[in-house]
């Protein structure tokens, strides 16, 4: 493969990475994290950390499978996808329940009669972003290997392809979390509107997660693979 062809393939990988970051299960999962942020830069970094987790996992597992010339079974691949559905439901419910905790903290603050603010936002949830990025990376490893092997010929070319693809996912999710973070940031001082956004995001994540698991388990036959 000459340099021009390789550059074209790497560019395509970068563009596909941006597109890949915009898949529904990706953006919905990260939205449940972004919706609880009140600073735009924190929203942006949530996307970056998702991309880091996603890319590092694809790189490690993808290259391991390519070098060992192995394949991930359909059952394992679908099971990892099913795990994504579980996390979507968990993150969705957690986002909704976070409103209850915020209300309880606000209520406690009124009874303390203190001028010192009580921060209900504990830490920056970069670990959550990194975690869901890793899970998404694991779930997408099988497809990534197939895409890489059908695109390039050598292992080092595969490494470059995954890196460019990963860079695209980081940029794609960074762009998305920055854009989606704007309404959450602007509504941070308007409690009712901000909480409504969180409730809607949590509800969408929960419903989509249930649909995602049902589709994998029933429609695509994962449950049958488990019990065969």
Swiss-Prot record:
It is a multi-pass membrane protein. GO terms for cellular component: plasma membrane. It holds the Pfam family DsbD_2. It comes from the Bacteria. The chain crosses the membrane at residues 48-68, 79-99, 130-150, 162-182, 196-216. It is found in: Cell membrane. Keywords: Cell membrane, Membrane, Nickel, Transmembrane, Transmembrane helix, Transport. PANTHER family: CHLOROPLAST PROTEIN FOR GROWTH AND FERTILITY 2, UNNAMED PRODUCT. Probably facilitates nickel incorporation. May constitute a multicomponent high-affinity nickel transporter. Not essential for the expression of catalytically active urease. Belongs to the NiCoT transporter (TC 2.A.52) family. This is Urease accessory protein UreH. The lineage of its organism: Bacteria, Bacillati, Bacillota, Bacilli, Bacillales. The gene is ureH.
């Amino acid at each position: 493969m000459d340099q021009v062809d390789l550059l074209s393939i790497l560019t395509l990988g970068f563009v596909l990475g941006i597109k890949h970051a915009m898949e529904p299960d990706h953006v919905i999962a990260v939205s449940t994290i972004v919706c609880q942020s009140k600073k735009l830069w924190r929203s942006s970094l949530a996307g970056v950390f998702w991309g880091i987790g996603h890319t590092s996992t694809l790189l490690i597992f993808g290259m391991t499978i390519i070098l060992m010339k192995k394949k991930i079974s359909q059952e394992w691949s679908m099971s990892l996808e099913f795990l994504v559905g579980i996390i979507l439901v968990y993150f969705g419910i957690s986002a909704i329940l976070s409103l209850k905790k915020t209300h309880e903290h606000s209520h406690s603050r009124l009874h303390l009669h203190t001028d010192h603010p009580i921060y209900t936002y504990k830490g920056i949830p970069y670990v959550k972003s990194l975690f869901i990025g890793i899970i998404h990376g694991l779930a997408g490893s099988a497809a990534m290997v197939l895409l890489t092997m059908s695109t390039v010929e050598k292992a080092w070319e595969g490494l470059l392809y995954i890196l460019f693809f990963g860079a695209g996912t980081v940029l794609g999710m960074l762009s998305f979390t920055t854009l989606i973070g704007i309404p959450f940031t602007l509504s941070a001082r308007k409690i009712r509107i901000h909480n409504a956004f969180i409730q809607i995001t949590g509800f969408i994540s929960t419903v989509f997660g249930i649909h995602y698991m049902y589709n994998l388990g029933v429609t695509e036959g994962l449950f049958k693979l488990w019990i065969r």
